[in-house]
Amino acid sequence: MNLSEKAKQHVDSCRFCWMCHHICPIGNATGHERSTARARALGISLVNREAIDLSEIMDNIYECCTCGGCVHDCTTGWDPVMFTKEVRLKAALENKLPDYINKLVDNCLDTGNAYGETELSADLKNAIAAHSEKTDTVLYLGADARYKMPCQAVKAIKVLEKANVSFTVLEDEPASGAQLDFLIGAADETKKQMENAAQVFGGYKTVVLYDPTDAKTVKQLYKEYGIEVKATTVTYTSFVAGLIKDGKLNAKNTGKTVVFQDPYQLSRDLEETEEPREIVKAFAELHELFLNRSETVWAGNLLMAEYIPDVIAEVAARRIFNAESIKESVIVTACVSEYAALKSVKQDKVEILSIEDLILGE
């Protein structure tokens, strides 16, 4: 396997280091050392030394959620996410992806989303149709909201309607490239999706990115890949926080006590932590989880639930337990995928709300 020298250096530095193994949300959920960044690096180093074949470690490579908790915690600056994504790309180029990943990749290429979905729910179709006219601002919902959580996509639209914002929602959204980037890294196919989306976004003055996964991709990864977006790109939370600040979205604080679950894409990658809190504090009394802001613990997602659903359910259950342990009974999310993961856990001790639920009083 022909990894970059940078990746090899990081792999050899991580393979015998235990300092972040307690950070990994997947490792904590499985209880297996093999799920951690250290074990992943050890496996890659064995492939590099031709001791084992690349195909033998690929299940482990796809256990990484790329949340960057290990990277954030590393005092010496090593980056397991970087070498994990590079190995995924190499596996794709060498035709050594697991079958379950190949299926998701094929879906992305065929339908624009990893789930292979082509039809929207009737409610979402109607909500989109009401905003089909071209304006200066486009609300980009993303694949998870459109195909897996359409009820949340409708709520995201309703929030902007409540503020009397003039905006467009596309019936046929281009793929942002976020899912392909997760699955196969910086492949040509990933970049083509990104370039296509950037071209569509360029037809508007402002692009509001609902899903933090898409926000990270468009605002951070596009720059790394040399892709320019001519429009101004903003996260949904920063946009809504601005509406509240400008008095366009009326807020009534219910006094309900809640904790906020920071999406790592916002808090660690985009360094956006206060805007969602401004929204929450306008509608409720905000308390904090023990690990918050850049120290946040990932709570699961929809894409990985396609191939390791039991593990993702345990990841979400552990985050709910974090709230329960400090006697908090409501978690508010700003990521549709984390919301879905948390809501999927069968329990009755902690209520799961999205920011849209909080604003709309639902």
Regions found by a protein language model. Give the residues of each.
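Conserved beta-strand elements of the Class I
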Residues: V138-L139, V259, I331-V332
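Iron-sulfur (Fe-S) cluster-binding segments and ferredoxin-like electron-carrier domains
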Residues: H22-V47, T76-L93, A305-A316, N322-A323, ...
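C-terminal amphipathic alpha-helical segment
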Residues: T235-F283
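Short, conserved active-site entrance elements at the starts or edges of catalytic domains
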Residues: L139, K230-F239
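Iron-sulfur-cluster electron-transfer modules
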Residues: A41-Y222, G226
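Ferredoxin-type iron-sulfur electron-transfer modules and their immediate structural context
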Residues: M1-I61
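Cofactor-cradling patches in redox/metallo enzymes
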Residues: D144-T232, S267-E362
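Short cysteine clusters
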Residues: C14-C20, C24, C64-C70, C74, ...
